[in-house]
Every structure is written in structure tokens, then in C-alpha cells.
């Protein structure tokens, strides 16, 4: 009974944080597999199910507020759908301790990208324009890394979009939308293990 209460409270707290900032999902795999001792695949499946729900609700709200660039989201998500499937497959081939290290590196990379954005703003202040194939490739790589590590998506996608010059609210909306396309193959893949 206590475990169910922890899961519900953690999902509500993390879901709220994801909706506000686009970041926080990385806490769930750590909680489930680390603190609660769930098998890694079960913790990942449960985490990605929560990411799916927060992605749908968050993307819908950002779309209604006109803070979702649907074209950009679809381009990134096309790559993420394939990348996430690849990430799940790679995760199942790797040692669990290596996967945890990758999660920590993804979180670190997210923080570094935020610092880079502050520095780049001072130098240029402009928005980078990447070609469509570049956005699909971006989605492929970030989808694979997020599904592999359990990071969810927005923790890596949102700050990198901001580094590329996407306005913060739009970056959060796109990252939440994209997290749906990372969560679907990840949730299914980890559930089947």
C-alpha cells in the first residue's frame, strides 16, 4: 500500500514539474529502480508511461497557449520514434550500472547546455535555423539517449532547443510533444521485458 502511495505522489509531483519546466522526469527511474528496488525494465516502463501522460497533457496545454511549434515537434518526433526504439534495444544489451551512468551524463549534459545558452545569448542572440533532416537527426539521437537512459526526453531536448535559439516556452512545448514519441516505443519495449 505504501509503495502505491509513493508511486502516485512521485508521479503527481514529477508530472507537475514536467508541465511547468519540461524537466524532472529523470527522477522517476531513479526512484523506481534505486529507492524502491524495482527491476530496471519495470521501473523504466512505469516511468515512460508517466512521461506519456505528462507529454500528452503538457503538449495539449502548450498548444492551446500557442507555445507549440507543431512542425518542429513533428520533425524531431519522427527521429525520436526510431531513436527511442533503438535506445530501448541498446539498454537491454547493456549492464545496468552503465545505463545509470548514461542517465547521469544526460542530466549533466542538460545542465551544461543551459550554461552554454547563457553564454551564446551574450555573443549572438539569434535563433539557429537547422534543416529538416537536421531536426530529424536531432530527434533520432536525443530519442535514443533518452530511451536508453530513462531520462524521458524533455531534460535533454528542451535545453538543446533553447541553445539552438528556440524561445523557452516553445522549447518546453516541443519537448513535451516530443516526449510522447519517445515514451510510446519505450513504454512498450520495457513492458515486454
Region locations from a protein language model:
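Membrane-embedded alpha-helical transmembrane segments of multi-pass integral membrane proteins
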Residues: 54, 110-113, 182-185
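Conserved, well-structured core segments that form the ligand-binding/active-site neighborhood
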Residues: 151
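Juxtamembrane transmembrane-helix boundary motif
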Residues: 1-42, 57-148, 158-170, 192-193
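Hydrophobic alpha-helical segments of membrane proteins
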Residues: 148, 180-188
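Transmembrane helix-bundle signature of multi-pass membrane transporters/permeases
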Residues: 44-52, 172-183
Amino acid at each position: 500500500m505504501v509503495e502505491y502511495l509513493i508511486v502516485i505522489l512521485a508521479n503527481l509531483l514529477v508530472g507537475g514539474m514536467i508541465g511547468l519546466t519540461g524537466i524532472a522526469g529523470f527522477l522517476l527511474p531513479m526512484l523506481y529502480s534505486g529507492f524502491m528496488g524495482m527491476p530496471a525494465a519495470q521501473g523504466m516502463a512505469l516511468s515512460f508511461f508517466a512521461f506519456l501522460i505528462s507529454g500528452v497533457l503538457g503538449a495539449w496545454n502548450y498548444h492551446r497557449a500557442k507555445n507549440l511549434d507543431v512542425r518542429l515537434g513533428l520533425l524531431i518526433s519522427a527521429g525520436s520514434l526510431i531513436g527511442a526504439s533503438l535506445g530501448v534495444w541498446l539498454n537491454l544489451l547493456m549492464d545496468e550500472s552503465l545505463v545509470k551512468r548514461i542517465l547521469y551524463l544526460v542530466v549533466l549534459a542538460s545542465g551544461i547546455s543551459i550554461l552554454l545558452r547563457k553564454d551564446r545569448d551574450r555573443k549572438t542572440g539569434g535563433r539557429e535555423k537547422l534543416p529538416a533532416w537536421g531536426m530529424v537527426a536531432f530527434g533520432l539521437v536525443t530519442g535514443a539517449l533518452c530511451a536508453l537512459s530513462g531520462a524521458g526526453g524533455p531534460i535533454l531536448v528542451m535545453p538543446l532547443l533553447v541553445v539552438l535559439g528556440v524561445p523557452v516556452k516553445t522549447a518546453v512545448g516541443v519537448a513535451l510533444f516530443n516526449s510522447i514519441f519517445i515514451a510510446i516505443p519505450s513504454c512498450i519495449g520495457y513492458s515486454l521485458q
